[in-house]
A protein has these predicted regions:
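Cleavable N-terminal signal peptides
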Residues: 6-7, 17
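N-terminal edge beta-strand
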Residues: 19-35
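Short, surface-exposed alpha-helix to beta-strand junction/turn motifs within ectodomains of secreted
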Residues: 40-65
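Short beta-strand segments within Ig-like beta-sandwich modules, predominantly Fibronectin type-III
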Residues: 67-72
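Extended, polar beta-sheet/loop recognition surfaces of beta-rich domains
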Residues: 35, 39-46, 99-112
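Short strand-edge motifs at loop-to-beta-strand transitions and within beta-strands
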Residues: 74-78
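A glycine-anchored, Pro-Gly-centered beta-turn/N-cap motif
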Residues: 84-93
Length: 112
């Protein structure tokens, strides 16, 4: 019995942690009102697979806003031009080393 428990413990300790990627933080934070941001930064809990991760920005009418974007090791950064006052939605998707796609969105409001 001791040998079986030891084997199980050894496998459990040596197995990699395959957690799904989740959004850990963002700037701006969801639901905030801010002046037009020069950067929108999403920080994730796990390393991203850049080829399969990204984000888009849209206005209250659902129109996609053109932005420059960069996917880093654990971040997605959007660089919009000056945003007019209104509500905006960032829709993101990420794939981590576990190969599971996770997605979500966050909204913020630009004020004059």
């Amino acid at each position: 019995m001791k040998a079986i428990l030891s084997s199980i413990l050894l496998v459990a300790i040596s197995s990699p942690a395959w957690a799904h990627t989740r959004l850990a933080s963002s700037d701006p934070k969801a639901g905030t009102s801010i002046k037009s941001p020069s950067l929108i930064r999403l920080v994730f809990s796990e390393t991203l697979e850049p080829a399969f991760s990204g984000a888009t920005l849209s206005d209250a009418a659902g129109k996609t806003i053109p932005v420059s974007a960069a996917v880093g090791t654990t971040t997605i950064t959007l660089m919009p031009l000056a945003l007019k006052p209104g509500t905006y939605t960032v829709r993101w998707h990420s794939v981590g080393h576990d190969t599971h796609r996770v997605s979500g969105d966050l909204r913020f409001t630009v004020v004059p």
